[in-house]
Amino acid sequence: EAGVSQADIKYASIYDSFTITVVMQIEDLGFCAKGDGGKFVSDGNLIAGVGKFPINTDGGGLCNNHPMNRGGMTKVIEAVRQLRGEANSVVQIPNCDIALAHGTGGGLGTRHGSATLIFERE
């Protein structure tokens, strides 16, 4: 375990194959209660600069056309950009010192898996 709580995480890159995927994952990761994900999102909590918990400041897979086999590396790249202060200035999270990258995958009807990485800037 990383020894951090959800409140410590300033930014998250979350796999977003579909809109509902984000809602399910923020609930499963404990950033809001089960069943409250839709309201959490519609209240603007995920928007950089104004929300409590900005995610996918690179636009995520839905914005980047979800290219085939883009994998979790794009999640790691944006998390590291945030930690280094190198994200686009419009979406840079001030004083971002802990970031999360989370992904799920697998073929439909076959094996599925997920991974969560937590990064800290020192």
Residue spans for each PLM region:
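Claisen-condensing/thiolase-fold acyl-transfer catalytic domains that form or cleave C-C bonds
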Residues: E1-E122
